[in-house]
Design a protein with these regions (language model features):
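Short, aromatic-enriched amphipathic alpha-helices that serve as compact interaction elements
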Residues: 59-78, 176-191
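Surface-exposed beta-loop interaction hotspot
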Residues: 157-194, 200-211
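Surface-exposed, charged secondary-structure patches
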Residues: 88-92, 96-146, 207, 211-261
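Short, well-ordered alpha-helical segments enriched in acidic and aromatic residues
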Residues: 68-98, 102-103, 192-206
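Coil residues (strongly favoring Ser/Thr
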Residues: 32-33, 38-39, 43-44, 132-135, ...
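Bacterial signal peptide processing site
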Residues: 19-23
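Sec-dependent bacterial lipoprotein signal peptides
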Residues: 1-17
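Short beta-strand edge/turn micro-motifs at domain boundaries
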Residues: 140-174, 260-281
Length: 281
């Protein structure tokens, strides 16, 4: 990997140029993707589903939670097989009840789109390998607009992952409540977002003219609107393996579903409020 150090103005010009080219490439890619999608035959779709079914039958989806959840969100019959009805549910009012059908469980569209998000307490946690021996993982569906969330708890039982319970609650009951309230406004209010950037924002982006090269440096907060990537908004996810959160730092990883692409947003709390400190793609 080649690293380039640019003076402030040079970096600014290059970033704007890079983004402009990136938008053009993205549009072309989207057009190509649309064409490919439109030309897929029902046979090819069935073939993909058949491959997933074979993976389930051969127990290849239970090696790690990441493997399992990717398949689980795409195969309704697997969801039916691996959901332990009646499913215990704690409501937002604190009442204990049960869910007896898939409709009440809700869909997993928040994990089946173009991307999903995971929050970590540090870069070290993000870079660490997920433990294949994990036996319990929680998946949060976070609604930033209503400031509510539903937690899906998955447990590995007899070697296979199962959805075992649900928990609905408002932000105030979660350890990340302060950050979620901040991020709900950060992702929906451009003025607030601009005010919540570190004075010197560290960026690390891939050079569109050389995929093996990385452009690294700092930009002024005022340049963020020209460079600004699409920040996750609306309904986001958080897969909780065994992260340890503090009130000083949150690392948000935006992962392309099945593409291997990722963006990383690092937020810090300086005692007065949360600020975006760095961004990398």
């Amino acid at each position: 990997m080649i690293r380039k150090t640019w003076v402030f103005m040079a970096l600014a010009v290059l970033i704007v140029a890079s983004c402009t080219k990136g938008h053009t490439d993205t549009q072309e890619t989207m057009q190509d993707s649309t064409w490919v999608t439109d030309t897929l035959t029902s046979d090819s779709v069935a073939e993909v589903e058949e491959e997933m079914d074979e993976a389930v039958e051969e127990n290849r989806v239970d090696g790690s939670f990441d493997d399992f959840i990717f398949t689980f969100t795409r195969l309704p019959h697997l969801q039916a097989q691996r959901t332990d009805f009646p499913l215990p549910l704690i409501t937002a009012e604190g009442e204990e009840t049960t869910v007896s059908n898939r409709h009440e469980v809700g869909d997993f569209g928040f994990l089946g789109g173009d991307y999903y998000t995971v929050l970590y307490g540090s870069m070290r946690e993000l870079e660490a390998e997920h433990d294949s021996a994990d036996s319990l993982v929680k998946v949060d569906r976070v609604d930033l607009e209503s400031q509510s969330m539903r937690t899906y708890t998955f447990e590995r039982l007899n070697g296979k992952w199962h959805l075992t319970r649900l928990h609905d609650r408002m932000f105030g009951e979660d350890i990340l409540s302060d950050f979620y309230r901040f991020y709900a406004q950060f992702s929906s209010d451009s003025t607030f977002q601009a005010q919540s950037l570190a004075p010197q924002l560290h960026v690390s982006i891939h050079d569109t003219e050389d995929e093996l090269s990385v452009i690294e440096g700092t930009i002024d907060a005022s340049q963020w609107t020209s460079f600004c990537p699409e920040v996750p908004s609306g309904i986001i996810s958080n897969i909780r393996y065994n992260q340890h959160y503090t009130r000083q730092s949150i690392v948000m990883q935006k992962c392309g579903m099945g593409t291997g692409l990722q963006e990383v947003f690092v937020f810090h709390h300086d005692g007065t409020g949360w600020h975006l400190k760095s961004y990398e793609d």
